[in-house]
Amino acid sequence: LDASKCADCGACKNACPANAIAAVGKDLSIDTGKCIFCGDCATVCKMNAITFSQEYRLANMTREKLIVRSGEIYEPERPTNREFLRFCSKSLKIRQISAGGCAACELDFNVLGTLAWDMGRFGIQVVASPRHADCILVTGPVSRNMLLALKKGYDAAPHPVWVIACGACAISGGLYQDSEETMGGIEEILKPDLYV
């Protein structure tokens, strides 16, 4: 985000389907916890104040770190929590719970087990039951119909269990954040330990 190039026209904010852009004058910020990375904001910005990089490390331990402000260079957060580092140092058993999503994040997660990415080589394995899981990876905006299933899945896991919010929908509700049929993400239900 380059505030010096911003014409303060509001086109980027109006083009954003996820309401991820905040603008106070020429000071811009993008909430990557809401952003679906469609690129519409960059396309409509005639001044090129918004551009997307090739940075793929988008995970953070806190929700606030997902907000990128003009003039800041995005730097991925390094995990410093000793318990988290110890937790991830051996093997990791993940139970993925789809809480009413469109399947986009589920597909992205599933591809991590293929030959090209092979998360198993790092000791990461998807398990069929939350009873065998070290962490719960949640995708989707948490529809009202999936709320009970999500809570039961979390409760069934041996504690302490880590919670990963994967994708804009799980983090903030994404495109469905204003829907009465969703909970607007998992933060009000389960506190995520990691945001992806």
What kind of feature is each model-predicted range?
Residues 4, 33, 139-141:
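Structural motif
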Residues 10-59:
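Iron-sulfur cluster-binding cysteine motifs and their immediate structural context
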Residues 1-8:
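Extended, small-residue-rich solenoid/repeat segments and analogous flexible loops
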Residues 1, 94-96, 163, 195:
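Conserved beta-strand scaffold positions in the cores of enzyme catalytic domains, especially
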Residues 107-109, 114-117, 121-196:
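Cofactor-cradling patches in redox/metallo enzymes
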Residues 42-129, 181:
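Flanking helices and flexible, charged tails adjoining ferredoxin-like Fe-S electron-transfer domains
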Residues 8, 12, 76, 80, ...:
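General structural feature for long, well-ordered alpha-helical segments within catalytic domains
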